[in-house]
């Protein structure tokens, strides 16, 4: 597809570009960047004056629930939600039914995405067979099938020797390992952050140590193996400190956090609000500040949503039995732009966190507007105001703690391979 994007503020950290430029896409790839570009007659054009033009945003941690759990979400609805949030690519976690631990399931997702998805969908395979944490999955086959990473997300690989072998094997074949880091014995029957609020509500708590201990293990295993590891959804002061120190001594560790961890505290659980129930749980104000600081100083490499759709019947129940997780694809950019408005990040940092660096971690040929690159583009209006309403969310599920919130800033065009797949 051909497209001319005219006069926007192009921000592309992969090239060190922050300037008002035109972007010309031809046959789905970036043909030229410059001022006053001319396009062949009949080429569609977008006037991006006053708007921000970035490489397509990438969410490296989503749950599309397909196969097997399509009553919550499916590839079509999840991709519509992604497009509405400004994401041109998503990487989907393997805790489906059946799990993504075979070439057949990975191929199913890739083929279904080709016919139904508005955006690029990259599957993540399991670290272990069946996601059971007992023996390694066929990582080589998963990579050959198109998986961009492996993870047992939803639960940790508890066996340290098995995780060591996973890191070493993944290093050998060049695939990213994403760790869901928590000590299940410490988590116990906890359902929210352990602290004043959990005590007041009479709910069993999950201590910050459950995350910190598990993150420390992954760091030491990666250091020992000389292998990279990516830590999913960090949420604590300690996790950020451990990773910051590890990076300083050369450990190949990267990590992500989610918008809810730098926006909400465990106070959001008051009223037994199940849309504020997730894993890891919402933490304290000090933890929120640590996430903002980690994003600002480069300790945290990526912002990922952990988009986790659930049917109302799984959320409209007692807090103790409600399932963990929230939808996040359509609110992520607005919540992240708030950090720019607050002066905690600049736009170049934000684009790196939401596009360039996720692409690098997953080994994707995305996250850049270099000539010859795939023509995936997100066009953002930083001043556009909107309200989060369940009826207007594209996701099949509506389990968001941000319903009713007034937001500022959102994607107004999402472009995949030169084709506009979403327009606000």
From Swiss-Prot:
Provide the cofactor list for this protein.
Zn(2+)
Involved pathway(s): Pyrimidine metabolism; UMP biosynthesis via de novo pathway; (S)-dihydroorotate from bicarbonate: step 3/3
A Gene Ontology biological process noted in the UniProt record is: 'de novo' UMP biosynthetic process
Keyword set, alphabetical order: Hydrolase, Metal-binding, Pyrimidine biosynthesis, Zinc
Q: What does the entry list under GO cellular component? A: cytoplasm
Active-site residues? 306
Q: Where does substrate bind?
A: 63-65, 95, 279, 310
The Gene Ontology terms for molecular function here are: allantoinase activity; dihydroorotase activity; zinc ion binding
EC top class named in words: hydrolase
Q: Where is the signal peptide?
A: none
Do you know which InterPro entries this protein is assigned to? Amidohydro-rel, DHOase, DHOase/Allantoinase_Hydrolase, Dihydroorotase_CS, Metal-dep_hydrolase_composite, Metal_Hydrolase
Q: Which domain of life is it from?
A: Bacteria
The UniProt annotation places Zn(2+) 1 binding at 61, 63, 153, 306
Q: Briefly, what is this protein's role? A: Catalyzes the reversible cyclization of carbamoyl aspartate to dihydroorotate.
What HAMAP family does the database record attribute to this sequence?
A: PyrC_classI_B
Name of the protein described by the UniProt record = Dihydroorotase
């Amino acid at each position: 597809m051909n497209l001319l994007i005219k006069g926007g503020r192009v921000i592309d950290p992969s090239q060190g570009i922050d300037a008002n430029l035109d972007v010309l896409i031809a046959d789905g790839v970036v043909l030229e960047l410059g001022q006053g570009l001319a396009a062949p007659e009949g080429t569609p054009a977008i006037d991006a004056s006053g708007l921000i033009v970035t490489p397509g945003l990438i969410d490296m941690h989503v749950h599309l629930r397909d196969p097997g759990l399509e009553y919550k979400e499916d590839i079509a609805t999840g991709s519509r939600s992604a497009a509405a949030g400004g994401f041109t690519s998503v990487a989907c976690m393997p805790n489906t039914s059946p799990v993504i631990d075979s070439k057949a399931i990975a191929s199913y997702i890739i083929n279904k995405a080709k016919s139904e998805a508005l955006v690029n969908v990259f599957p993540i395979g399991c670290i272990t067979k069946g996601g059971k944490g007992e023996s390694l999955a066929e990582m080589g086959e998963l990579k050959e099938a198109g998986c961009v990473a492996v993870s047992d997300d939803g639960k940790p690989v508890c066996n340290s020797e098995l995780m060591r072998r996973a890191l070493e094997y993944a290093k050998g074949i060049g695939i990213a390992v994403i760790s869901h880091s928590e000590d299940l014995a410490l988590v116990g029957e906890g359902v929210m952050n352990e602290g004043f609020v959990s005590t007041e509500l009479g709910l069993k708590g999950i201590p910050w140590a459950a995350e910190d201990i598990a993150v420390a293990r992954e760091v030491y295993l990666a250091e020992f193996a000389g292998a990279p590891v990516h830590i999913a959804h960090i949420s604590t002061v300690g996790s950020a400190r451990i990773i910051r120190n590890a990076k300083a001594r050369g450990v190949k560790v990267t990590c992500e956090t989610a918008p809810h961890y730098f926006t909400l505290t465990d106070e959001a659980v008051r009223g037994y609000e199940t849309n504020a129930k997730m894993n890891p749980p919402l933490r304290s104000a000090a933890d929120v500040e640590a996430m903002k600081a980690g994003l600002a100083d480069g300790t945290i490499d990526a912002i990922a949503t952990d988009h986790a759709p659930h049917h109302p019947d799984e959320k409209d129940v007692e807090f103790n039995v409600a399932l963990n997780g929230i939808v996040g694809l359509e609110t992520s950019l607005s919540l992240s732009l708030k950090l720019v408005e607050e002066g905690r990040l600049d736009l170049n940092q934000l684009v790196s966190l939401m596009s360039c660096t996720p692409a690098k971690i997953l080994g994707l040929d995305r996250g850049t507007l270099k000539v010859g690159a795939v023509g995936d583009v997100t066009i953002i209006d930083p001043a556009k105001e909107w309200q989060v309403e369940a009826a207007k969310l594209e996701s099949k599920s509506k389990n968001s703690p941000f319903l009713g919130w007034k937001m500022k800033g959102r994607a107004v065009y999402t472009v995949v391979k030169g084709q506009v797949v979403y327009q606000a």
